[in-house]
C-alpha cells in the first residue's frame, strides 16, 4: 500500500495539484481572517467566522502575527511551484525554500513601517520588526528599503528565469532596431534624387506581415578586393546610361506568400524525464562494459544530445559501435554517436518522443538570414539547440547534397532556391537548373532568374556546363582587364565609375608590328554592367554520370576549382552517393557537403568521410559539413508545393525571363576538347575518326574508342565503315589493319 502511495505522490501532476490545493487553502484562510476570532492571543466564546473553521482562525492569526501581509507570498509560492511541477520545471527543495524565506523576510521588512487596524502588530509582522531593527543599525531607512526592494526583484527574476527575460529583451531590441533601420532607409531613399543604378533592396529585406514593395535604395556591394590594377586604366568623362533589362523590373517576392508558423508548439520532455533517460542510457552503457558519466543534456527540436564523458582508457570506436545496441535497448528509432569538436565528450543523440516541425517563413524572418554580410544565404534549418543555421554559398563555395528517397533532399533543394529568390532579383543572381528527372525543378521553369529553361536532356546539360566554363573564363578576362580579383571587386569598380559618370577603357597588347617590331595596342571599352551571381543546380548527378561521366566530371572539376572568384557556384545533388557517382575528383573540389539519410554506412563514408548518416531520421534531418570539415546535425524546414507555386507565379508576373540561347545550343565545331557521343551525330564522329587514323596512323578499335571517348561498339562500327570505304584494310591473321590513306 505504501508503495502505491509513494508512486502516486512522486508524479509531477499529483504534486502540482497538491501544491495548488494548499495554496488555495491558505488564500481562503488569510482572506476570511477576523481579528475577533479565537486565537492564541484572544479567548472568546463567540463562534468563529473563518471559512476553514477553528483551524483556519488559529493558522491565519499565526501567519499575520509572524509575517503580516507578506504571508500572501506563501500561497503565491505554492502556485508557482505547482506550475513548475506541472510543466516539469523542477527545482530542488532547498533552493525553493531559500527563495520563499528570502521573499518573506524582504517583504516583511518593507511592510514593517505600515500600521493596519484589521491585523495585529503591523503590516510586516514580528519578522519584519526584528529584521528592520537589526538592519537599521548599519544603514538608514532609505537604503534599507532599497536593499530589500532589490532582494524582492532578484527573487522574482529567479522564479521567471534570467534566460527568459534576457531572450525577451533581445527580441524587443532586435524589433526596435529593425524598425529604426527601416525608417532611416525610407528617409534616405526619398532624399536621393539621382538614381544611377537600378534601385533594388538587396542588403536587407524589410519583412512585414502583409506585402509591401521593396524600398528603393542604391545598390551596395561588399567593400572588398579593391586592389589597384597593375596595368594603366583610362577613365573618360562620358555620359553613362546603364542598361536596364526587362528582368530588372522584377521585385522580391513578399513574405506573405510563405506559410505562417504553427502557433501550437510541441511540448518537450521535462527535466525529470531527461534525467531518467540519462540514467537509462548509463545503465545500458554499463551493461556493455562502458564506464563514464553524462555531464550535460542538450534538448533540441528533433533530437536530444547527451554529452557522455567516457572513463579513461575507453576507445571512441568502441562507444560509436554500440549505436544500434543502444537504440534497441532504449526502444529508439536510431542513435547517432559522434565526437563533439573541442570537448572531451561524445555526443549521443536520441530522437524525441514528439518531433517539432517548422516552416521556412520562421527562418526567413531571423536576423541570421537578413544579415547583409552573407552574400548568398542558404537556409539550412535549426541545429541541435534549436538555433537557426544559414550558410553562405559564396564561402563554401560549392555544395554537394546526397540522400535517399524520402529523406528530404528535394525539399532541402527547394528551400535553398527559395532562400536565394527572397534575397536577389534577376539582375543580381541567375540560375542554370539541370533536372534529368524532369520533375523536381520543373516548377521554376519560366521565372526571370533563369538563364535558360530548365535543362532535362543530358546532352544539353553538358553543353550548359561548357557554357558555364566559357563564361567563367570570360569573366576572368574582364576582371583582369580592370585589375580586380573577384566579382565583388569588379562590381564595385563598375558602380564607382557609373556614379562618377565615367567609362573605363584599357589598352591591351594584341601583337607586334612586322616592320618596326613595336608592340601593337588595342583600346578596349569595358561594359558598364554588373556581373550577376550564377548558381548552377544539378538535381540528379547519377543520371548525368551514366550518360557522359568523363565529360561531366571534367567540367564539374574545372568549375569547382576556378569559378568561385567569378561568382559561379554549384549545388549538386544525388540519390546514390556511390564512388562511381561521387568520384574522388568531385569530392576533393566540394569541401562543403550535406548528407540526408542514406541506406548504409558505406554511403555515409562516401559523402562525409565517416558514418552516421544512416542513423538519421529522414524528413529533413541532415548532417552538414562546412568548409572547416566540422560536421553538425541540422533539421531542415518544410516548404510545400503550394508555397513554391505561389512564389514562382509571382515572379513570372513581375518579370519576363531573358534567356541566353547559347547556354544549351551545341556549336557546329566544338573546340573545347570535350566531346560526347550522345550529343554528336554519327557523321561527325566518322569524320573525326578518319582524321585520327590519317594523322596518328593508328586504326585499332580501342585507340579510336579512347580518342573519341565513345563506346566499344560504336568505335567498331566506325572502323568497319572505314574498311568498306577502303580507308583501312581488313584485319590480318594477327588482327592488325593497314592504313590505305596516304600520309599528309
UniProtKB/Swiss-Prot annotation:
The keyword Transmembrane applies. ATP binds at residues 406-411. It is a multi-pass membrane protein. One of its GO terms (molecular function) is DNA binding. Residues 163-744 are cytoplasmic. It holds the Pfam family FtsK_alpha. PANTHER family: DNA TRANSLOCASE FTSK (PTHR22683:SF41), SPORULATION PROTEIN RELATED (PTHR22683). This is DNA translocase FtsK.
Amino acid at each position: 500500500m505504501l508503495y502505491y502511495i509513494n508512486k502516486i505522490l512522486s508524479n509531477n501532476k499529483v504534486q502540482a495539484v497538491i501544491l495548488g490545493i494548499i495554496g488555495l487553502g491558505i488564500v481562503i484562510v488569510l482572506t476570511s481572517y477576523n481579528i475577533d476570532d479565537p486565537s492564541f492571543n484572544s479567548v472568546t466564546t463567540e463562534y468563529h467566522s473563518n471559512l476553514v473553521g477553528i483551524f483556519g482562525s488559529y493558522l491565519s492569526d499565526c501567519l499575520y502575527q509572524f509575517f503580516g501581509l507578506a504571508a500572501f507570498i506563501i500561497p503565491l509560492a505554492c502556485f508557482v511551484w505547482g506550475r513548475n511541477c506541472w510543466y516539469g520545471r523542477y527545482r530542488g527543495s532547498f533552493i525553493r525554500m531559500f527563495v520563499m524565506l528570502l521573499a518573506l523576510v524582504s517583504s516583511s521588512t518593507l511592510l514593517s513601517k505600515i500600521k493596519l487596524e484589521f491585523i495585529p502588530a503591523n503590516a510586516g509582522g514580528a519578522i519584519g520588526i526584528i529584521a528592520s531593527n537589526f538592519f537599521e543599525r548599519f544603514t538608514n531607512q532609505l537604503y534599507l528599503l532599497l536593499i530589500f526592494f532589490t532582494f524582492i526583484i532578484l527573487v522574482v527574476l529567479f522564479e521567471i528565469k534570467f534566460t527568459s527575460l534576457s531572450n525577451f529583451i533581445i527580441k524587443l531590441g532586435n524589433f526596435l532596431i529593425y524598425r529604426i533601420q527601416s525608417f532611416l532607409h525610407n528617409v534616405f531613399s526619398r532624399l536621393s534624387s539621382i538614381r544611377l543604378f537600378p534601385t533594388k533592396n538587396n542588403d536587407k529585406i524589410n519583412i512585414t506581415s502583409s506585402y509591401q514593395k521593396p524600398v528603393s535604395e542604391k545598390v551596395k556591394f561588399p567593400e572588398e578586393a579593391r586592389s589597384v590594377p597593375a596595368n594603366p586604366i583610362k577613365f573618360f568623362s562620358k555620359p553613362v546610361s546603364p542598361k536596364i533589362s526587362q528582368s530588372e523590373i522584377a521585385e522580391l517576392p513578399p513574405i506573405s506568400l510563405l506559410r505562417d508558423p504553427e502557433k501550437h508548439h510541441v511540448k518537450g520532455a521535462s527535466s525529470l524525464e531527461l534525467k531518467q533517460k540519462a540514467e537509462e542510457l548509463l545503465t545500458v552503457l554499463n551493461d556493455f562494459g562502458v564506464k563514464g558519466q553524462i555531464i550535460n543534456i542538450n534538448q533540441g527540436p528533433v533530437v536530444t544530445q547527451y554529452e557522455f564523458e567516457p572513463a579513461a582508457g575507453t576507445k571512441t570506436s568502441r562507444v560509436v559501435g554500440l549505436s544500434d545496441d543502444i537504440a534497441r535497448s532504449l526502444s529508439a528509432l536510431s542513435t547517432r554517436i559522434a565526437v563533439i569538436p573541442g570537448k572531451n565528450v561524445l555526443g549521443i543523440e536520441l530522437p524525441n518522443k514528439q518531433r517539432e516541425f517548422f516552416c521556412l517563413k520562421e527562418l526567413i524572418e531571423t536576423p541570421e538570414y537578413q544579415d547583409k554580410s552573407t552574400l548568398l544565404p542558404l537556409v539550412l534549418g535549426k541545429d541541435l539547440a534549436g538555433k537557426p543555421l544559414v550558410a553562405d554559398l559564396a564561402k563554401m563555395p560549392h555544395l554537394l547534397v546526397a540522400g535517399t528517397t524520402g529523406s528530404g533532399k528535394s525539399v532541402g533543394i527547394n528551400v535553398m532556391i527559395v532562400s536565394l529568390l527572397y534575397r536577389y532579383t534577376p539582375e543580381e543572381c541567375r540560375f542554370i537548373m539541370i533536372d534529368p528527372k524532369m520533375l523536381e525543378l520543373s516548377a521554376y521553369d519560366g521565372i526571370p532568374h533563369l538563364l535558360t529553361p530548365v535543362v532535362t536532356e543530358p546532352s544539353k546539360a553538358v553543353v550548359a556546363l561548357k557554357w558555364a566554363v566559357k563564361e567563367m573564363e570570360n569573366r576572368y578576362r574582364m576582371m583582369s582587364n580592370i585589375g580586380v580579383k573577384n566579382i565583388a571587386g569588379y562590381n564595385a569598380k563598375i558602380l564607382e565609375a557609373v556614379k562618377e559618370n565615367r567609362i573605363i577603357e584599357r589598352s591591351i597588347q594584341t601583337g607586334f608590328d612586322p616592320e618596326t617590331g613595336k608592340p601593337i595596342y588595342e583600346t578596349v571599352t569595358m561594359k558598364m554592367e554588373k556581373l550577376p551571381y550564377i548558381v548552377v543546380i544539378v538535381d540528379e548527378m547519377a543520371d548525368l554520370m551514366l550518360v557522359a561521366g568523363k565529360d561531366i566530371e571534367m567540367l564539374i572539376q574545372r568549375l569547382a576549382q576556378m569559378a568561385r572568384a567569378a561568382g559561379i557556384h554549384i549545388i549538386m545533388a544525388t540519390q546514390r552517393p556511390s564512388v562511381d557517382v561521387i568520384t574522388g575528383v568531385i569530392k576533393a573540389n566540394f569541401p562543403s557537403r550535406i548528407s540526408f539519410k542514406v541506406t548504409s554506412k558505406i554511403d555515409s563514408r562516401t559523402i562525409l568521410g565517416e558514418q552516421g548518416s544512416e542513423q538519421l531520421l529522414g524528413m529533413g534531418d541532415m548532417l552538414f559539413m562546412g568548409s572547416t570539415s566540422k560536421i553538425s546535425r541540422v533539421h531542415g524546414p518544410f516548404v510545400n508545393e503550394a508555397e513554391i507555386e505561389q512564389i514562382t507565379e509571382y515572379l513570372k508576373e513581375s518579370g519576363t525571363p531573358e534567356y541566353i540561347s547559347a547556354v544549351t545550343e551545341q556549336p557546329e565545331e566544338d573546340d573545347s576538347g570535350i566531346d560526347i557521343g550522345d550529343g554528336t551525330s554519327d557523321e561527325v564522329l566518322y569524320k573525326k575518326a578518319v582524321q585520327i587514323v590519317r594523322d596518328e596512323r593508328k586504326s585499332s578499335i580501342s585507340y579510336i574508342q579512347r580518342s573519341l571517348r565513345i563506346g566499344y561498339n560504336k568505335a567498331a562500327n566506325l572502323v568497319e565503315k572505314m574498311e568498306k570505304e577502303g580507308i583501312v584494310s581488313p584485319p590480318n591473321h594477327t588482327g592488325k589493319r593497314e592504313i590505305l590513306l596516304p600520309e599528309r
